[in-house]
């Protein structure tokens, strides 16, 4: 797992924003929501923004997390989505 200090800095459960940057794709937001649903079922309304040249899309989604391990698992699973370049 990742070596983070979320457990020292946050109280759980908490609403946590994730920003996923990936190749421009009409399905990126759907794939992000699918991962979120698999690890933290909920009603999600992500926002999507295209880069100035249209090469990349960023998807921002707020997910209710329950622990440090939950955040780390989400980061790992979101980063594994095909076409994803960064998870912030």
UniProtKB/Swiss-Prot annotation:
InterPro entries according to UniProt: UPF0250_YbeD-like (IPR007454), YbeD-like_sf (IPR027471)
GO cellular component: cytosol
Top-level lineage group: Bacteria
Gene3D superfamilies assigned: 3.30.70.260
NCBIfam families recorded: PRK04998.1
Similarity comment: Belongs to the UPF0250 family.
The protein's name: UPF0250 protein Spea_3154
Species for this entry: Shewanella pealeana (strain ATCC 700345 / ANG-SQ1)
Native organism taxonomy: Bacteria, Pseudomonadati, Pseudomonadota, Gammaproteobacteria, Alteromonadales
């Amino acid at each position: 797992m990742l070596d983070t200090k979320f457990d020292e800095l946050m109280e759980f459960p908490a609403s946590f924003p994730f920003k996923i940057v990936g190749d421009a794709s009409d399905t990126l937001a759907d794939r992000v929501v699918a991962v979120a649903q698999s690890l933290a079922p909920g009603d999600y309304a992500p926002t999507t923004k295209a880069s100035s040249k249209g090469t990349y899309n960023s998807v921002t989604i707020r997910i209710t997390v329950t622990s440090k391990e939950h955040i780390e698992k989400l980061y790992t699973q979101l980063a594994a989505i095909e076409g994803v370049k960064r998870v912030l």
